[in-house]
Amino acid sequence: MTKTDIIIAIDPDIDGSGVAVFYMSTKLFQVGNMTLPKLVDFLKDKKGWCEGEGFSLIVVIEASYLVSANWHLSWDDSRNRAAAKGRQVGRNHEIGRQIAEFCKYLDIPYEEKLPLKKCWAGKDGKISHDELMQLMKGMDLPAWTGRTNPEIRDAMLLALDRSGLPLRMKR
């Protein structure tokens, strides 16, 4: 894993992918949710800016489509509910594949990363806002003052994982 100046981590989603840009030199984040068209424009702009400034860039995409088996059903789901869940999961997987395809087309270095283990206290094992703040504090990173949603938190966690910095919690 080579060191990079800027890490763009993406948690693909139909309604708006979570995007976290981590600047290694300042240890600062830029985060938000973007639809696929806006994300493609953002990646083009960021690539051009990095080339002009002489920074290296990598895009990390959470690639849940690489997991061979995902179980999203509960015991009381009807057939219609099961079909709707499967359709939604498939649509999210396709967004991730399309982001990877755009990166390839735009000649932007990217990695497809298996989802990180869900070992947090938040809903469905996802990281909560408080846990993310504790993690950033434990890593001596500047505190994040804005609000976050699950997609943004997952993207931030992906970026921190890719950064190579030791992940430490501070309670």
Describe the role of every protein-language-model region.
Residues 2-171:
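Phosphate- and other anionic-substrate recognition elements at nucleic-acid/protein interfaces
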